[in-house]
Amino acid sequence: MASIFLNKKTIETNNFIFNDNRPKNIKIVDKIKSSTVEFFHSIQKHIQQVKVENNNNNNNNNNNSENNKYKRSQSEENINNYIQNHFNPPQPQKKRNILFIFQNLINSGNSNNNNSSNSSCNSTPSTSPSSTPRSTNSPRSTYSPRNNNNNFTESSSDNQQFDITFNMVVEKERVILTVKVPEVGLTKKILFDKVETIKDAILLVIEKLPPGCLDASEYNLFLPQKNQWCKIDSRFSKYQFKENQEIEFKKDSRGGVSHMLSNVGNLLTRPYRTIYIKLPEIVTVGTLPPLQINGQIGDLPSLNNSLNNSLNNISSSSSGGTGGGSGTTAAATGSSLSNSNSNSNLQNSQSANNSPIIHRRRTSSFSYDPNIHHSSLTHSNSNSNLISTNTSSIGNSAPSPTTLGSKPFSIPKLNLTENNLNNSSSTSSSPRNNGNEVIQSSSSTSSPRVNAPPPLEHKKSFLNIIGISPRGTNRERSSSTNSLNNSTSSLKSSNNNILQQQQQQQQHYDSAPTTPRNFGTFVRTQQLQNQQQQLQQQESIEAFDFEDDSTLGEVLNKICTRYQYIEKDLLEDYSLITKDGLWFVDRNKTITELGLKHMDEVEFKRMTQKVKVVFLNKEIVLNFNPSDTLKEINYKIIVHYLPSLIKLSRSNSILSSSSSSIFLNHQSSSSSNSSSSPSQSYRSSLSLEPLVISDLENSQILSNTPTITTVGNHQILNLQQQQNKQRSYSDASPLSFSKDYTSEISNHQQQNIENHINRRKNSISTNPLTNSGNIANNNNNNNNNKDKDDNNNNNNNNNNNNNNNNNNNNNNNNNNIASSTDTIQSNSSTGSLGSNNNIAFSIQQNRYPIPDNLVEFKDFKLHLSGTKNQNPNINQKFDMLLDERRTLSSFNFWNNIKLHFKNSSKSLHSDSKRVAPTLPFYLQIESVEQFSVSHILELEGTLLISDILKSFNRLLLNNENIKINDPLDEYGLFFNTVNNGNREGLSYGSSIYLDPYKTLSHYPMIEPLDKLMFKRTNTIFGVDPNTIVSKIDPITGFNIPCLLLDLKQKFIELDGFSIEGIFKTNNYYDLTFTEIIKEIENGTLLTSNNPNVDAIGIACFIKRWFSKLPKKICSLLDDETLLYASTQESTAEASLDSIPQPYRSLLLWLVRFLSEVSQSAYTNKCSAKILAIVIAPNLISISPNNNNNNKENNDHHHHHHHHHNSHHHRDNNNNNSNNNSSTTPTSSSVGKYTSLEKLHQCTLFLRNLIKLKLRENGFLPISTSSISISNSHNSSSFISMTGTSETSIHSSNSPISSSISRSPSLTDIVEE
């Protein structure tokens, strides 16, 4: 709704002032048949006639009141007739309102005629102070000028103003639009001021562009939101442009008659041919569109409605309503706006449900689940249209009606389909009849003869007028239609179908995607085999008209306009392929030279994938076939590239390179025997700069490579052409691989192999159970030491390894047969050898023979490593080993992904999933302080944060080298904003906690391979003491955390000093800890009387707090200092200076507290010795891997023996009721002894400090006599005076010697 303010000045000068913020005062009519401008022109014209008549009457000096009354009544009658004839208001009250306004305008014109002529035309009208806004309760209000409570006030001043509100959008005269010029690659904001027609707007845009860059006669304005062109001769205000609305300025392929005449002339005079091209769906790493489950709308990403805000910020649920400046008239906005509003309301009601929804992956324009029948997805026409049209075109970050007011959902992917990559294109699919046929609309980026005229623009096109029927691009494809159908039947297209599609189509997004995950692309249509049938029904084949002299590069550039939001270096990996598997690579050849005929069908498909391979501190940029498996790629790297890389490390010369193009022909492959020997370039580098190998046809590298190879069902023929081209770094485009570069075994080699096996058959036992073992033993004798691996070692046990593959053990150096896990295992090969044919067949299956000089690299494979912010303090870094059975496209890698080619048998790695995730997403999770481990995880993109936590916890629990003492429920994932660059929506200098109940889509700042920190989620345990709120302890004078002081005070209130076994008891419950944490966070620990909080729980809480410190207090002392501090009290006091603050203050506070507890040892049975034994394990970290070098030197049997003993020892410790420590040292015997020795020293150190504090308090006389801390419960006092020396405490007769000194019972003082 828009408010229009009129006064006498604006009417006389034809200046209408629009203000959307004014209150809506007077509602005259609901619908106006004529346009707004014509309406006001009519009002102005009629009022001008009335004013002329009144002026004539005034000049005649006719002051007769009766005459004036008659003329006034006559003017009212004329106005009444005018309104009745032109507007025909349905209600009498509206007629009276119009008459009232007209009469006041006439009266104001009569009384102020002389003053109005001298007034300024640009004065701004002021609002009457007595006006009040209209009540919103009643739908319609009547007005009368009798009091100040009405919304209209009559005045005789020049600035009198009247508010008229219409149910129609009125566009401003001044509007700023964002104009995109795709041909120039320019986006500018242009102010359109007093522009009357579209032609004037075009001339204004031409003035703002660089001079001479575009021709105004060939360009027009295009509205991507409505997918329509503007009429050149139409008024500019007709299209109701909004502020900062985005429009496109490009060549008009169907705008006017002149354009169509020129196009028809070109078609009649210049040779052309039409090519049908299948356009794939390209998905870019980012966010995924909304999902539909059983016809319902799932959780959708809620985006900010403001275009000025960041396109990456995801906001919470917002209202679906529009502001005061939006219009609702169907004639102005079309039916698409009303459809989108209804669908948006449906989504808002659906998003109110907070229950988690399992999100499924979309494979086409509608969501597909193999477990759900297809009919359930499209049972609702409104919902199916919404999902099928809008969700397939998601990719821009600007909001749309279907994404406002919804919850974030579960996928961090950005779907840039072919439908929305170009805003001028529109593709929609709607089920017809039984759902087998799908209509797809055409794109406006193709030729003008192909695209049908837009709806609501002109009913008849020029081609229909002159009798030429345009070829449409909408094909009716049945469900049984295969890709690239051989049929070239005519395409069915009609304006009615297009009009119906345009009415159902949702508004496209306005701006290009700018999410930080925009790294690369992959073809979604090649991921899962069970989705191929659904994808075949959604084929997008469009017709393009090209001139005969058009080159392949021009053809690809025209196709790439559909994917204009993807970087061009990514689109360079795409090319055309025919139905017969013919790739077109030479972009300088014309379509005539390439053999493309009229009405041919080709496919626009990805041909190569750029990968950075890191080997021996060198980077090379290679291009691989996305359909190749990792096993094939690993073999190609070893055979074709490792020789050059090894030579690079030995050569200092930089040679010139030559590149070659590939022309892959299926038909000529059977008869072609071409050979080539271009020179291969080698390039040395002492740094980590990427090396680009642009030529593969080297006689030295590809000497064993056949000319004819196979890619799937297509054969490949390599035709080398010399081209002198300079290539450098990532701008180079290395040659792509074929699927199989293997050489068949020649007849001579096959004969030698058969003769060799026949000679050895006589030495093989006839027992099939021992055949594999004998073959393995014989082959192991012939192999070199460097060729022995785990497969050969495992074959030493003949009776236990009958299932091993014999072909893997036939490593004969004379015949150059390398082991391979790709051979076929069968009964004939695992059992008796059988005939020679079986042997020959098994050997031929080994398609990846490695030369002798490269056998040492047979275990080298590709790994995915963390490349961002490497932490040198990580002890165990697990890279992800890429599964060799998966294809490169299944990993969803972006261009220039960095993969490390290294040994997979010795390095730490975690295997990738055998079954490829439907939406893979890669994260690096690191835990520094607690476990010092880092993992690269390949996760399903639909997982919650809690699922990612479970996956990482499973890796930690399965790692035998990691000792976990704490429950993993206390840990969570954090995103560190300090080391992750400048990204929008981040508060730097802190870590963002990832909510376990949310998905990755809630955190759009997380990019693939970002590092997440695995650390504690609470603010009490495991926190650095420097970051905790502290205050001065009045007793000790140290700066102590407030929570420790509150816990001690609560302990005193609960009379914890008199409870027996107060620090020895560990039978606390999780409920107690939960209640204590809750009261500490709320600050009610000292004031509440919670029955679940007792003194034993407080004591256990203090022990847990000291055990969870990031740095254990006694671990800060080196071994020599700790040994020195454990000897006597004076050395213990002197060693305190070696402990840094604030840990020294914490230790002294704890010693003071324990000394106070030990003073009541008669009642609580906790002497200084017992307290030292109980608390010491919490002050020192005991690692089970103190002697890893000794463990590695032990053989397997010896290691297993000690491993069994350690488990038996752990069971004994758990069953011992006298042990009260919190750590169990389990390792080899040497490591166990070292850990217990340090624990013993820590116990003596703590006991000496407690004794020293007791001496300071006056409980012990300062003399040469010593103290013996008794463990007997029958003694009347915990202090016994003896005349022996201080060293008598370690004698064998001492009651504590069996518990503290080194003896076989040292484990009695150790407890978890």
From Swiss-Prot:
Region of interest (Disordered), residue spans: 52-74, 111-158, 314-519, 762-831, 1185-1230, 1282-1312
One Pfam family from the record: RhoGAP
Domain of life: Eukaryota
The encoding gene: gacG
Organism ancestry: Eukaryota, Amoebozoa, Evosea, Eumycetozoa, Dictyostelia
CDD domains found in the cross-reference section: RhoGAP
Any GO CC annotation of this UniProt entry: cytoplasm
Ranges of residues in domain Rho-GAP: 1030-1212
Main location: cytoplasm
Keyword Transcription: no
Source organism of this protein record: Dictyostelium discoideum (Social amoeba)
UniProt-annotated location(s): Cytoplasm
Protein name (database record): Rho GTPase-activating protein gacG
Functional note: Rho GTPase-activating protein involved in the signal transduction pathway.
